[in-house]
């Protein structure tokens, strides 16, 4: 947030949409600003606003979905609860967890540029993760990383059970329930 100190504006916190940026700005760049700015992911901000009742999801959103934990939000930042808190606050949302979730979740394959790696034998990383999604038999995959969304959208045709899968950001799903 921004606060006024005397007649000057001071930036106190930073919010990122991208978990990769969260890592870079919050951990790498923090070395240069002595860690004086807190950097949080947008799902952490949304979860906090929901807890403070500054956001109130009221519209019914009848969807069954599964949630994919992005590597940089989960394993690198330790945040697994905020996206689920946001989704669970939405009336009508039913979350069907994949067997491998939270700290056991597999990468979507976008991290480290694996999306562009040509696999000659076996399956792409995204195919492995999409098979886990397919096992849940849901029509929607929620995530909170735009890189994951891009990779899942480009890979969903490779796995029969996920050809028609809808992929959507947690904040976008929440917005359907806010009046």
Predicted regions span which residues?
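A short, acidic, amphipathic alpha-helical segment used as a generic capping/interface helix at domain edges
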Residues: 121-139
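Single conserved hydrophobic/aromatic residue that forms the stacking wall/gate
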Residues: 1-11
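Long, compositionally biased charged/polar accessory segments in the mid-to-C-terminal portions
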Residues: 93-99, 117-126
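Catalytic cores of enzyme domains
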Residues: 45, 55-77
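Local cysteine-cluster metal-coordination motifs and their immediate loop/turn environment
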Residues: 15-24, 68-77, 102-117, 139-154
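Active-site glycine- and acidic-residue-rich loops that bind
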Residues: 72-89
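Helix-enriched interaction subdomains in cytosolic or periplasmic regions
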Residues: 12-45
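Short, flexible loop segments at boundaries between secondary-structure elements
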Residues: 35-59, 100-103, 160-179
């Amino acid at each position: 947030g921004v606060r006024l100190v005397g007649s000057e504006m001071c930036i106190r916190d930073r919010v990122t949409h991208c978990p990769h940026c969260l890592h870079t700005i919050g951990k790498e760049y923090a070395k240069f600003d002595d860690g004086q700015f807190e950097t949080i992911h947008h799902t952490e901000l949304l979860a906090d606003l929901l807890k403070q009742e500054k956001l109130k999801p009221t519209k019914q959103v009848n969807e069954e979905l599964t949630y994919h934990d992005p590597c940089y939000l989960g394993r690198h930042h330790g945040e697994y609860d905020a996206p689920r808190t946001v989704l669970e606050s939405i009336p009508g949302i039913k979350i069907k967890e994949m067997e491998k979730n939270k700290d056991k979740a597999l990468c979507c394959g976008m991290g480290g540029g694996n999306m562009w790696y040509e696999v000659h034998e076996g399956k792409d990383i995204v195919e492995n993760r999409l098979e886990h999604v397919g096992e849940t038999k849901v029509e929607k995959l929620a995530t909170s990383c735009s890189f994951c969304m891009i990779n899942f959208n480009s890979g969903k045709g490779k796995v029969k059970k996920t050809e028609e899968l809808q992929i959507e950001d947690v904040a976008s799903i929440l917005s359907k329930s806010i009046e």
